[in-house]
């Protein structure tokens, strides 16, 4: 299965494992909660989806790579303890707490979360001396004498032996204790993730054209030659930073991430062409609705590669605006909730809110720091916390004369925040409408329109914005996309029917 399907499977398993009966006990006993084992090539996003699942479920997350662990670090260090049996004192062997189990307790203490995911990567690379202990751990969640705390679910991962020399296959006894999920590199699944997270449009459009360059591992006379999803994702982030600093993105940089000489060279050539398209088409003017007719005509006459690049530029620019608008809207909703709680805590209308503001600022900052340290701070939460803290900071500055801060003044500052959001939403709605107008003028209802509608549909920020604020052109063209998909499905069924009749 692809990484998107794997995420759904794991998330469903986590929900089942976390379910409790009427008495608060987990419905599936610990020894029957099979650890999930993700088996797949390196760099396809196994660790990333586990972090996302932990954030989605709002549970703790601890990640460990097993490659560097010895028997002592995994099980704990032995020491001599005194025990009395039948009135006779004996020296017995005990173990200190496992480094891994201790990390789980540390995470619980830091975040206050009693439930979480313990993710152990490269588990099929452990040393042979650790294998018997791992077998016990996989079934009973015990390292040495210490058990994984109740409420913490074990997920493991590893690479097949053909990708990792130190990896070894498990025997049937081990496989029979695991919930195995085989993950394959899949561009279509990664593309949805890339659109949502804002992967550089040059990377996205290049891979739209050269899909077989998405993931490749080869053995050459010079050693391994490879390119992975992780490589493209990391290259994308670096390209954005280079562009912000006006540092050239060249083949030397690309080759540090895309470790296949041929693909690195071809992408370097494509990127140079892409930057030319970006300068020529002036995407900002398209979204402002002020693109010149010559730009529309050039797009209409453009070759396939240029059209793909242009649509990538448009959807990337739209995606950034949609993401920012949705995150700001959720930040305003979060701030409204905090202010409502503050208002309810005041005993007198328009009372001095200064003590509550200070208390709220300290609480939010502590919450932000804790979730960041635990790796549970999503971008949406970060923006919400920072916007609320900025609002509180502005309110606290109103106490410059030492007379306190009436709640009405806090409400006025929040009103300015809402006005700024309304202006942003109006601007994004206009940009969305102008993008559809441009694509209609240049390409009518061609494949480019289907690409625009599809990219908006798989982008959760795009769909959140459109569902909340509407977009008539999106809904009209989405109907066309549904008819197209139904027609394609019908044609596929007819082809299968014809094939069956021929075979008969």
Stretches found by the model and what they are:
Residues 1-212, 217-220:
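AAA+ P-loop NTPase catalytic core and its hallmark functional loops
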Residues 3, 20, 98, 127, ...:
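Short, structured coil/loop segments at alpha-helix boundaries
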Residues 196-355:
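Alpha-helical lid/collar subdomain of P-loop NTPases
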């Amino acid at each position: 299965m692809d990484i998107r399907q794997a995420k759904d499977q794991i998330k469903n398993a986590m929900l089942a494992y976390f379910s409790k009966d009427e008495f608060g006990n987990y419905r599936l006993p610990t020894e029957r909660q099979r650890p999930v084992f993700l088996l797949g090539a390196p760099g396809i996003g196994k660790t990333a989806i586990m972090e996302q699942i932990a954030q989605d479920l709002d549970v703790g997350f601890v990640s460990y790579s097993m490659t560097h662990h010895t028997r002592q670090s995994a099980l704990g260090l032995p020491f001599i303890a005194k025990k009395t049996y039948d009135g006779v004192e004996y020296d017995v062997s005990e173990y200190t707490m496992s480094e891994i189990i201790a990390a789980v307790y540390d995470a619980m203490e830091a975040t206050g979360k009693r439930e979480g995911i313990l993710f152990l990567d490269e588990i099929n690379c452990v040393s042979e001396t650790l294998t018997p202990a791992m077998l016990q751990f996989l079934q009973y969640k015990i390292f040495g004498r210490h058990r994984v705390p109740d409420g913490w679910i074990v997920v493991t991962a590893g690479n097949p032996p053909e990708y990792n020399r130190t990896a070894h296959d498990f025997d049937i006894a081990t496989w029979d204790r695991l919930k195995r999920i085989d993950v394959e590199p899949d561009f279509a699944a990664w593309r949805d993730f890339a659109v949502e997270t804002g992967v550089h449009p040059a990377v996205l459009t290049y891979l739209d054209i050269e899909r077989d360059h998405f993931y490749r591992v080869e053995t050459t006379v010079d050693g391994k030659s490879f390119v992975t999803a992780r490589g493209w994702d990391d290259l994308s982030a670096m390209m954005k930073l280079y562009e912000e600093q006006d540092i050239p993105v060249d083949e030397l940089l690309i080759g540090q991430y895309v470790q296949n000489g041929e693909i690195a060279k071809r992408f370097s050539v494509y990127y140079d062409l892409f930057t030319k398209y970006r300068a020529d088409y002036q995407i900002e003017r398209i979204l402002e609705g002020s693109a010149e007719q010559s730009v529309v005509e050039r797009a209409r006459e453009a070759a396939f590669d240029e059209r793909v690049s242009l649509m990538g530029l448009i959807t990337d620019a739209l995606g950034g605006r949609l993401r920012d608008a949705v995150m700001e809207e959720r930040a305003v909703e979060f701030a409204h909730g905090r202010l409502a709680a503050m208002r309810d805590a005041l005993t007198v209308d328009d009372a001095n809110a200064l003590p509550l503001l200070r208390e709220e600022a300290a609480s939010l900052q502590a919450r932000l720091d804790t979730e960041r340290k635990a790796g549970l701070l999503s971008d949406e939460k970060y923006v919400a916390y920072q916007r609320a803290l900025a609002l509180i900071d502005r309110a606290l500055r109103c106490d410059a004369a030492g007379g306190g801060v009436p709640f009405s003044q806090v409400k006025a500052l929040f009103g300015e925040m809402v006005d700024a959001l309304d202006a942003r939403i109006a601007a994004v709605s206009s940009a969305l409408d102008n993008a559809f107008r441009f694509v209609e003028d240049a390409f009518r209802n061609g494949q480019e329109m289907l690409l625009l509608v599809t990219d908006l549909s798989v982008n959760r920020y795009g769909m959140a914005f459109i569902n909340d604020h509407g977009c008539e052109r999106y809904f009209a063209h989405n109907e066309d996309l549904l008819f197209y998909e139904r027609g394609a499905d019908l044609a596929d069924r007819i082809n299968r029917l014809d094939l069956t009749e021929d075979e008969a």
